[in-house]
C-alpha cells in the first residue's frame, strides 16, 4: 500500500496524505487524491477520498481533512475537477461529499464489485474549480 502511494506521488504528483489529530498527533487515517483507473465513463478522472479509523468517525475529522485537500488542489495544482464515490450504503461518506460542496451526479454499479454484492451500487459526486 505504501509503495503504491509513493508511486502515485512520483507519477502523478499527488496521492494520499496521513491525517493526524492536532492535539496528540495520533494517526487517524488518510485523505488525498487518486487517479481513477478502473473501467467507468469517468475513468482517468481524479478521485478525492478519505478513510479514517472507526473511532474517529462522526467527529468532523473527515470533512476537515477533505476540505484541506480540496483547498490545496484548488490553490496549488492545475486540476479542475475531482470526483468522489462510495457505496450507497455508506451514508457517512456521502455526507462528507455534501459537506465539502460536491454535487451528486448519479448512481452506478462499481465494475470491481460483483453485481449481487450489497456494496455494488455506488453514488458519484464531483466538484469543479
Report residues per predicted region.
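Acyl-donor (CoA/ACP) binding surface of acyl/acetyltransferases
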Residues: 18-129
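Active-site rim helix/loop that mediates acceptor-substrate recognition in acyltransferases
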Residues: 1-13
Amino acid at each position: 500500500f505504501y509503495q503504491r502511494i509513493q508511486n502515485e506521488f512520483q507519477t502523478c504528483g499527488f496521492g494520499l496524505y496521513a491525517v493526524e489529530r492536532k492535539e496528540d498527533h495520533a494517526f487517524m487515517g488518510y485523505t488525498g487524491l487518486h487517479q481513477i483507473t478502473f473501467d467507468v465513463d469517468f475513468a482517468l478522472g481524479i478521485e478525492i477520498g478519505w478513510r479514517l479509523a472507526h473511532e474517529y468517525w462522526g467527529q468532523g475529522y473527515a470533512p476537515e481533512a477533505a476540505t484541506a485537500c480540496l483547498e490545496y488542489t484548488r490553490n496549488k495544482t492545475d486540476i479542475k475537477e475531482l470526483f468522489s464515490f462510495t457505496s450507497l450504503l455508506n451514508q457517512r461518506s456521502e455526507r462528507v461529499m455534501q459537506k465539502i460542496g460536491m454535487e451528486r451526479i448519479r448512481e452506478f454499479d462499481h465494475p470491481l464489485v460483483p453485481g449481487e454484492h450489497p456494496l455494488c451500487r455506488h453514488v458519484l459526486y464531483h466538484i469543479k474549480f
